[in-house]
Amino acid sequence: MRHYEIVFMVHPDQSEQVAGMIERYTGSITEAGGKIHRLEDWGRRQLAYPINKLHKAHYVLMNVEADQAVVDELETAFRFNDAVLRNMIMRTKAAITEPSIMLKAREERVKRDEMKFDADVE
């Protein structure tokens, strides 16, 4: 089995359905004997440029270990799902399990905001 990094962007109006989509996609990977090494839901983010007149999208990152057949199935599922605006499936040399830069930045921002809130309370 090979390692892949998968990023897909979901229409912002469909953000409530992202959890179900993640469950469906991870389920198809694990049923075929694959493994999920990293799964990050980055939430709604501003796009660098408009896609279909949209300026925001819901981002999801997955690092998986799977067979080519499963990756082809995912690619087809992304293509026929109207809620998925864009997707990227990239093969990697090894499993990546550490948090991404995007997640680290969000955690640092949350910590900074908590510290600021604590300082304001005192």
Curated annotation (Swiss-Prot):
Gene3D superfamilies: 3.30.70.60. It holds the Pfam family Ribosomal_S6. GO terms for molecular function: small ribosomal subunit rRNA binding; structural constituent of ribosome. Keywords: Ribonucleoprotein, Ribosomal protein, RNA-binding, rRNA-binding. GO terms for biological process: translation. One of its GO terms (cellular component) is cytosolic small ribosomal subunit. Binds together with bS18 to 16S ribosomal RNA. Belongs to the bacterial ribosomal protein bS6 family. This is Small ribosomal subunit protein bS6. The lineage of its organism: Bacteria, Pseudomonadati, Pseudomonadota, Gammaproteobacteria, Vibrionales. The gene is rpsF.
